[in-house]
Protein backbone atom coordinates (compact mmCIF):
# COMPACT_ATOMS: atom_id res chain seq x y z
CA UNK A 1 0.00 0.00 0.00
CA UNK A 2 3.02 2.30 0.38
CA UNK A 3 4.76 1.39 -2.87
CA UNK A 4 4.84 5.01 -4.08
CA UNK A 5 6.39 6.27 -0.85
CA UNK A 6 8.96 3.47 -0.80
CA UNK A 7 10.03 3.82 -4.41
CA UNK A 8 10.09 7.63 -4.35
CA UNK A 9 11.91 8.10 -1.04
CA UNK A 10 13.82 4.81 -0.67
CA UNK A 11 12.27 4.50 2.79
CA UNK A 12 12.82 8.07 3.92
CA UNK A 13 9.45 8.42 5.64
CA UNK A 14 7.81 7.45 8.90
CA UNK A 15 6.28 4.08 8.09
CA UNK A 16 3.47 4.36 10.62
CA UNK A 17 2.84 8.08 11.04
CA UNK A 18 3.11 8.99 7.34
CA UNK A 19 2.53 5.66 5.62
CA UNK A 20 -0.55 4.65 7.57
CA UNK A 21 -2.91 7.15 5.96
CA UNK A 22 -6.65 6.89 6.67
CA UNK A 23 -7.17 4.75 3.55
CA UNK A 24 -4.19 2.49 4.23
CA UNK A 25 -5.42 2.01 7.81
CA UNK A 26 -8.90 1.20 6.48
CA UNK A 27 -7.46 -1.53 4.24
CA UNK A 28 -5.32 -2.85 7.12
CA UNK A 29 -8.38 -3.05 9.37
CA UNK A 30 -10.41 -4.80 6.66
CA UNK A 31 -7.60 -7.34 6.21
CA UNK A 32 -7.62 -7.80 9.98
CA UNK A 33 -11.40 -8.38 9.97
CA UNK A 34 -10.86 -11.19 7.47
CA UNK A 35 -8.04 -12.64 9.60
CA UNK A 36 -10.34 -12.59 12.64
CA UNK A 37 -13.09 -14.34 10.63
CA UNK A 38 -10.61 -17.05 9.64
CA UNK A 39 -9.64 -17.47 13.28
CA UNK A 40 -13.31 -17.76 14.29
CA UNK A 41 -13.85 -20.39 11.59
CA UNK A 42 -11.25 -22.51 13.38
CA UNK A 43 -12.63 -21.88 16.87
CA UNK A 44 -10.32 -19.05 17.93
CA UNK A 45 -11.30 -15.60 19.17
CA UNK A 46 -8.13 -13.75 18.16
CA UNK A 47 -7.24 -10.23 19.23
CA UNK A 48 -7.69 -7.53 16.63
CA UNK A 49 -4.54 -5.74 15.51
CA UNK A 50 -5.57 -2.72 17.59
CA UNK A 51 -6.35 -4.93 20.59
CA UNK A 52 -2.97 -6.59 20.21
CA UNK A 53 -1.18 -3.24 20.10
CA UNK A 54 -3.15 -1.98 23.10
CA UNK A 55 -2.31 -5.12 25.06
CA UNK A 56 1.39 -5.14 24.21
CA UNK A 57 2.00 -1.42 24.56
CA UNK A 58 -0.43 -0.81 27.44
CA UNK A 59 -2.34 1.71 25.40
CA UNK A 60 -5.94 2.64 24.60
CA UNK A 61 -5.89 3.27 20.84
CA UNK A 62 -9.36 3.45 19.28
CA UNK A 63 -8.34 1.98 15.93
CA UNK A 64 -5.28 1.11 13.84
CA UNK A 65 -4.92 4.62 12.43
CA UNK A 66 -4.98 6.02 15.97
CA UNK A 67 -2.21 3.56 16.91
CA UNK A 68 -0.13 4.45 13.83
CA UNK A 69 -0.38 8.15 14.56
CA UNK A 70 0.06 7.94 18.31
CA UNK A 71 2.55 5.17 19.08
CA UNK A 72 5.77 6.83 20.25
CA UNK A 73 7.86 3.70 19.83
CA UNK A 74 6.66 3.06 16.27
CA UNK A 75 7.29 6.66 15.24
CA UNK A 76 10.68 7.14 16.87
CA UNK A 77 12.60 6.45 13.66
CA UNK A 78 11.59 6.36 10.02
CA UNK A 79 12.15 2.61 9.65
CA UNK A 80 10.34 2.23 6.34
CA UNK A 81 11.48 -0.33 3.76
CA UNK A 82 13.97 0.99 1.21
CA UNK A 83 12.71 -1.23 -1.61
CA UNK A 84 9.91 -3.59 -2.53
CA UNK A 85 12.29 -6.50 -1.88
CA UNK A 86 12.15 -5.82 1.88
CA UNK A 87 11.12 -8.52 4.34
CA UNK A 88 7.92 -6.63 5.17
CA UNK A 89 6.71 -7.64 1.74
CA UNK A 90 8.57 -10.87 1.06
CA UNK A 91 8.16 -12.51 4.46
CA UNK A 92 4.89 -11.02 5.64
CA UNK A 93 3.09 -11.93 2.42
CA UNK A 94 4.65 -15.36 1.91
CA UNK A 95 4.71 -16.56 5.50
CA UNK A 96 1.74 -14.77 7.03
CA UNK A 97 -0.83 -13.44 4.56
CA UNK A 98 -0.74 -16.43 2.17
CA UNK A 99 -1.19 -18.98 5.00
CA UNK A 100 -4.18 -16.98 6.29
CA UNK A 101 -5.62 -17.06 2.78
CA UNK A 102 -5.08 -20.82 2.50
CA UNK A 103 -6.73 -21.40 5.87
CA UNK A 104 -9.63 -19.17 4.85
CA UNK A 105 -10.17 -21.13 1.64
CA UNK A 106 -10.28 -24.40 3.61
CA UNK A 107 -12.94 -22.80 5.82
CA UNK A 108 -14.98 -21.65 2.80
CA UNK A 109 -14.04 -17.96 3.19
CA UNK A 110 -13.08 -15.94 0.12
CA UNK A 111 -11.14 -13.23 2.04
CA UNK A 112 -11.17 -10.71 -0.83
CA UNK A 113 -8.98 -8.09 0.87
CA UNK A 114 -6.33 -10.66 1.76
CA UNK A 115 -6.45 -11.96 -1.82
CA UNK A 116 -6.14 -8.43 -3.23
CA UNK A 117 -3.09 -7.73 -1.06
CA UNK A 118 -1.47 -10.97 -2.24
CA UNK A 119 -2.23 -10.11 -5.87
CA UNK A 120 -0.81 -6.57 -5.55
CA UNK A 121 2.29 -7.84 -3.73
CA UNK A 122 2.81 -10.40 -6.50
CA UNK A 123 2.70 -7.67 -9.14
CA UNK A 124 5.09 -5.24 -7.43
CA UNK A 125 7.60 -7.94 -6.43
CA UNK A 126 7.45 -9.95 -9.68
CA UNK A 127 6.75 -13.09 -7.67
CA UNK A 128 3.52 -15.09 -7.83
CA UNK A 129 2.90 -15.83 -4.16
CA UNK A 130 -0.20 -17.91 -4.81
CA UNK A 131 1.49 -20.29 -7.24
CA UNK A 132 4.23 -20.85 -4.66
CA UNK A 133 1.96 -21.17 -1.65
CA UNK A 134 3.02 -24.04 0.47
CA UNK A 135 2.04 -23.36 4.06
CA UNK A 136 -0.55 -26.12 4.36
CA UNK A 137 1.46 -28.45 2.13
CA UNK A 138 4.62 -27.91 4.19
CA UNK A 139 2.64 -28.69 7.33
CA UNK A 140 1.26 -31.87 5.75
CA UNK A 141 -2.24 -30.39 5.71
CA UNK A 142 -2.89 -29.72 2.02
CA UNK A 143 -5.43 -32.56 1.86
CA UNK A 144 -6.82 -32.04 5.37
CA UNK A 145 -10.36 -30.84 5.98
CA UNK A 146 -11.13 -27.65 7.88
CA UNK A 147 -12.11 -29.74 10.89
CA UNK A 148 -8.84 -31.69 10.80
CA UNK A 149 -6.85 -28.47 10.51
CA UNK A 150 -8.82 -26.98 13.40
CA UNK A 151 -7.92 -29.90 15.63
CA UNK A 152 -4.23 -29.65 14.66
CA UNK A 153 -4.26 -25.91 15.43
CA UNK A 154 -5.79 -26.57 18.81
CA UNK A 155 -9.08 -24.95 17.89
CA UNK A 156 -12.44 -26.56 18.19
CA UNK A 157 -15.18 -27.43 15.80
CA UNK A 158 -17.73 -26.47 18.45
CA UNK A 159 -18.52 -22.87 19.26
CA UNK A 160 -15.78 -22.54 21.91
CA UNK A 161 -13.47 -19.69 20.89
CA UNK A 162 -10.45 -18.75 22.97
CA UNK A 163 -8.17 -15.76 22.98
CA UNK A 164 -4.57 -16.30 21.93
CA UNK A 165 -2.30 -14.13 24.04
CA UNK A 166 1.15 -13.25 22.71
CA UNK A 167 3.94 -15.58 23.76
CA UNK A 168 6.12 -14.38 26.61
CA UNK A 169 9.82 -14.99 27.13
CA UNK A 170 8.84 -18.02 29.20
CA UNK A 171 8.62 -21.46 27.68
CA UNK A 172 5.40 -21.99 25.80
CA UNK A 173 3.24 -25.07 25.80
CA UNK A 174 1.45 -25.18 22.48
CA UNK A 175 -0.99 -28.05 21.95
CA UNK A 176 0.84 -30.04 24.62
CA UNK A 177 4.26 -29.66 23.00
CA UNK A 178 7.00 -28.13 25.13
CA UNK A 179 9.06 -25.58 23.29
CA UNK A 180 12.37 -24.17 24.40
CA UNK A 181 13.41 -20.57 24.79
CA UNK A 182 13.52 -18.38 21.69
CA UNK A 183 16.48 -19.08 19.45
CA UNK A 184 19.02 -16.27 19.66
CA UNK A 185 20.50 -15.04 16.40
CA UNK A 186 24.25 -15.24 16.14
CA UNK A 187 26.56 -13.58 13.70
CA UNK A 188 28.49 -15.95 11.46
CA UNK A 189 31.83 -14.81 10.09
CA UNK A 190 32.08 -14.80 6.32
Spans of model-derived segments:
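Short amphipathic alpha-helical segments, especially helix-boundary/capping motifs
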Residues: 8-13, 42, 73-79
Amino acid sequence: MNTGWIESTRGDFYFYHQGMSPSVAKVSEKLDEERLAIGRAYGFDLLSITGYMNQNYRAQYRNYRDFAQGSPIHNKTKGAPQSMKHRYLLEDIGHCIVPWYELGLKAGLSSPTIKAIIDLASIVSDFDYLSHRRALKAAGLSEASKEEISLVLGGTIEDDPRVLAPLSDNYANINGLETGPPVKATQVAA
